[in-house]
Amino acid sequence: MKKSNIYGSGDQRKVNPEWFTNKTWMKVLSGKIKSKDQDIYHVHFEKGSRTKLHWHNGNQVLIGVKGKGSLEIFKKYGTTKSNFKIKKVEKITLNEGDIVHIPAKTLHTHGSTDKKKEFSHIAINILAKKNSEYKTTWYESDFKSTVTKIV
């Protein structure tokens, strides 16, 4: 049995800046504890930063750690892979200690809601099948009505 700690700057995952609206960094937690059924990260969103709109091929669980954030769920309209209409259908506030489950293939965004304070959460990405790769599809959007392309 292995253990790790969610705090500290070690074990950083290289983050593609095109996946976020502002500076964000991720600490890999699953590597040291040898987790094989899920990828686990401590994700830090700088002031006002959010993920871009995206969905995963597996379920995801978020646990609020620091600050105030939100999870926003969107519905897709249209059949094309990119350049489609969207509508926000739910906004869930995430405070320290809150936990939320996001089903696979749910179009969503999450991150900080305060432009003056950071927000962090634990993300547990549950693999769709044992020994499979957890995949995320990222989109450019206006967060209101339109997705313009896959990032």
Question: Where is each model-derived feature located?
Answer:
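Conserved hydrophobic/aromatic beta-strand scaffold that supports enzyme active sites
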Residues: M26-V28, I40-H44, V61, K91, ...
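Histidine-centered metal-chelating micro-motifs
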Residues: S49-K52, S70, E96-V100, A104-H110
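Short acidic-glycine-tyrosine-enriched beta hairpin
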Residues: K76-K105
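A short hydrophobic beta-strand segment most commonly corresponding to one strand
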Residues: H101, K116-T136
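Short, conserved beta-strand element in jelly-roll/cupin
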Residues: H42-E46, W55-G78, I124-L127
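Conserved catalytic-core motifs of eukaryotic protein kinase domains, centered on the activation segment
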Residues: K75, T113-D114
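A short, N-terminal "cap"/entry segment at the start of jelly-roll beta-barrel domains
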Residues: M1-Q38, K52, K91, T136-V151
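A short beta-loop-beta micro-motif enriched in histidine and acidic residues
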Residues: K32-Q38, K47-I63, K87, L94
